[in-house]
Amino acid sequence: MLSRATRLLSTKNVVVNSIVKHTTIRSFASHGGGEAGGAYPTEPEAGTQMITRRVEFGDAVYSYKHGNFIVDPIQIRELAEEQQQQQHHVHGPGCSHGHHHDSHANDGHHDEHHDEHHDHVNPDDVEDEFPRGYFLNTPPSVPYPMNPYYLTALCLLPIIGSLFSIRYFDNKSENDYELFRSEYLEANPALKQKYYDITHKYPLSH
């Protein structure tokens, strides 16, 4: 939300000092700077007329409570509309707004050229979003994106499950083998006697 609001309040020739209680807008003439494709300077040149206005927004655009931003869509809409009007009308004489439409303001196609080259803000495009990453985004009641203990247990679950599965299937295989051997020896008495002699009467100790 902070970055979105900052983008709404930032232009090439507008310096925003604060967006919480008020905004101080400074603008100065940039004679041909935007027209020539150059960047607007951060400090005015000598002899440049400076215009300073203090814009009061009343209550804060957003409030900070319990580690979360509270977004008011109505205030965002009003701010976007007001700021769009300010950034097109509050400027020093000769300020070019990033292009050269002021240099031919008396031309017949001035309004058309102005609308074509300006990036107008649509308040409907302002989204309500929380200042957290998309992948770990959580509701505002959660103080942290993810509990580290919960994350550790979540990672250990597959390992613990694999160990239990191996133990279970090993025991099952051993029991199945013992059952098969006993049934096979009972069905073959001669083989059962020979097996007994080998394992008990003549143990394989050598």
Swiss-Prot record:
GO CC term (a single one): membrane
Localization terms from the record: Membrane
Region (Disordered): 81-132
Keywords per UniProt: Membrane, Transmembrane, Transmembrane helix
Stretches that traverse the bilayer: 150-166
Location (main, coarse): membrane
Stretches with biased composition (Low complexity): 82-96
Bias (Basic and acidic residues): 103-123
Keyword Transmembrane attached: yes
Disulfide bond positions: none
Topology with respect to the bilayer: Single-pass membrane protein
Full protein name: Uncharacterized transmembrane protein DDB_G0283731
Species whose genome carries this gene: Dictyostelium discoideum (Social amoeba)
